[in-house]
């Protein structure tokens, strides 16, 4: 005690002013202060996996936004004539790489091989790629790369109006593109109905009554055309008038006919034999019916004519970068539109769930007590309702309401509205639970008590002091909600529970379902139908997983300074 008094009663004269050099000062920071978000960004950039995931997500998002503007096709488009045509890129179409060139490996018998050769001979197109053919050891099967675009050939005979018949001739004369090809006389065609109107059969066949007709070859092994030839000076009334470009070899076919005089009598020589003369005959390009003209049109050129002259929809040729489905839908366009819908839908649902969940969870966790108990019981009751039941009830009852009220503009988005309500009904509960947990964790910390002591309002404490510390966990949950929503929506549309294939609306799951249908045929040439949507989904899920983990670590305040 005496010692303490001794120190307390120090005489003033014993004090001396210190030198300025003895004073201790905090060193001035040489660097600028780093904010919370700047530090989070630095930590995120040091996570290579998260950066790669973010880049992949950015590429997928840009694909969903930009790709629809670079294709004339839409999900509404479909053309059964070009079903299951393989992916084709202009970069590889004319190369010898045998990759992404619109071809597939075809295995067929000798008759099928002859039919493809016949199409090549008539149209001049390379249907058998590079003329490379492999024959099995027993000689029964032929293997070759088959062009799925040109191999469509002519399909069935078409009946068109005389006006359209004349317009096609006008188009041919202007462009020099051959759309119309010579027809075969009805009496010269195969007998069976399916073969009689098969426009690909333009040649002489061995047996007209056979189920599978076989081309008849000449002595040199060539296809024998069976076109309808007529005398232009005495054309039958059933031959439609034709005044346009003709195929090669139709410059007046020399035919030996019976010579007749001016009165129509047969001319005979001195020995009484019928005199023959050579006349120039031409091929018939249309069969005239009372109100229509029956024609043979090459599908590839007729497709171009339809879209450039009639529909004028911006489509210039049948060209599908990712191929087509069994119904003739363009996979590239459907995937782009489906991805765009998935991103927009998942983002909207995630944002709404995030806002509602944050508000609900923060109130529940901060105030606690009976209010927290009541709010938690409500969440448990609501969360116990299966999402599938909500979807089913909304699908039937809400769909009926839309149709009965004649809101036709909403019919196309009926399924999207049902999905939104279903995912929102219980989707925010998980975020609310995580937010509540974070508020319980931090609300009794010293800095929170200090802020309350200094008079900070509840809202300031909640969103200024507590919320930023729990942001890492919450943001991670948001980053994983988006792919989860996309995956759920894809699964429901894949299973057919929700139909998003209406108008210009489509889904990645619908494409995967189309791929499954293609696989049921056990044809590996159709694997591309499922390949592209599945690849998109796999990249999306993996990249969001990496991205979410990176965000969690970046927004974790306990890691502040760890990047130094």
Predicted regions and their residues:
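Aromatic-acidic/polar surface patches that form glycan- and anion
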Residues: 30-33, 48-51, 536, 540
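Membrane-topology segments of multi-pass transport proteins
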Residues: 1-46, 69-327, 564
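Alpha-helical transmembrane segments of integral membrane proteins
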Residues: 48-58, 324-564
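Residue-level signal for pocket-adjacent positions within structured domains
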Residues: 64-65, 79, 316-317, 487-492
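Short, strongly hydrophobic transmembrane alpha-helices
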Residues: 49-70, 358, 538
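Short, solvent-exposed loop/edge-beta patches enriched in aromatic
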Residues: 45-50, 340
């Amino acid at each position: 005690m005496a010692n303490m008094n001794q120190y307390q009663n120090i005489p003033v004269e014993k004090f001396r002013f210190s030198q300025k050099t003895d004073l201790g000062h905090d060193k001035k920071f040489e660097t600028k202060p780093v904010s919370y978000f700047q530090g989070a960004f630095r930590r995120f950039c040091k996570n290579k996996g998260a950066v790669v995931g973010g880049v992949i997500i950015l590429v997928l998002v840009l694909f969903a936004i930009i790709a629809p503007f670079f294709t004339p096709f839409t999900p509404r488009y479909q053309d059964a004539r070009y079903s299951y045509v393989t992916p084709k890129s202009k970069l590889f179409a004319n190369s010898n790489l045998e990759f992404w060139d619109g071809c597939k490996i075809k295995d067929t018998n000798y008759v099928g091989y002859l039919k493809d050769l016949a199409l090549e001979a008539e149209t001049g197109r390379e249907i058998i790629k590079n003329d490379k053919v492999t024959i099995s050891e027993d000689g029964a099967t032929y293997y070759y790369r088959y062009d799925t675009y040109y191999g469509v050939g002519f399909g069935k005979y078409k009946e068109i109006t005389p006006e359209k018949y004349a317009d096609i001739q006008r188009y041919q004369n202007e462009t020099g593109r051959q759309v119309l090809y010579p027809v075969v006389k009805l009496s010269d065609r195969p007998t069976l109905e399916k073969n009689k109107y098969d426009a690909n059969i333009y040649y002489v066949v061995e047996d007209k009554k056979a189920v599978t007709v076989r081309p008849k070859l000449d002595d040199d092994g060539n296809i024998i055309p069976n076109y309808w030839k007529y005398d232009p000076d005495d054309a039958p009334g059933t031959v439609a008038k034709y005044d346009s470009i003709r195929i090669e070899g139709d410059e007046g076919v020399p035919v030996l006919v019976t010579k007749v005089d001016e009165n129509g009598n047969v001319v005979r020589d001195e020995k009484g034999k019928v005199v023959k003369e050579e006349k120039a005959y031409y091929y018939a390009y249309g069969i005239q019916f009372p109100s229509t003209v029956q024609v043979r049109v090459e599908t590839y050129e007729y497709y171009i004519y339809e879209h450039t002259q009639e529909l004028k929809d911006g489509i210039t040729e049948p060209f599908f970068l990712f191929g087509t489905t069994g119904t003739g839908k363009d996979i590239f366009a459907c995937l782009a539109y489906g991805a765009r819908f998935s991103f927009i839908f998942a983002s909207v649902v995630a944002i709404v769930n995030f806002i509602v969940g944050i508000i609900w969870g923060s109130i529940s966790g901060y105030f606690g007590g009976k209010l927290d108990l009541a709010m938690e019981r409500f969440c448990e009751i609501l969360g116990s309702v299966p999402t599938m039941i909500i979807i089913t009830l909304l699908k039937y009852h809400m769909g009926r309401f839309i149709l009965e009220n004649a809101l036709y503009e909403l019919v196309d988005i009926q399924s999207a509205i049902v999905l939104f309500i279903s995912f929102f009904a219980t989707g925010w509960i998980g975020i609310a639970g995580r937010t509540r947990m974070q508020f319980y964790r931090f609300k009794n910390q010293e800095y929170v008590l200090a802020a309350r002591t200094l008079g900070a309002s509840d809202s300031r404490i909640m969103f200024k002091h507590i919320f930023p510390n729990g942001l890492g966990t919450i943001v991670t949950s948001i980053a994983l909600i988006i792919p989860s929503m996309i995956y759920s929506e894809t699964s429901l549309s894949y299973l057919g529970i929700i139909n998003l294939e209406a108008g210009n609306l489509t889904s990645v799951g619908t494409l995967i379902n189309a791929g499954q249908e293609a696989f049921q045929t056990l044809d590996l040439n159709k694997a591309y139908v499922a390949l592209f949507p599945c690849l998109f989904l796999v990249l999306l899920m993996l990249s969001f997983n990496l991205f979410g983990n990176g965000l969690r670590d970046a927004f974790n305040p306990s890691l502040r300074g760890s990047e130094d």
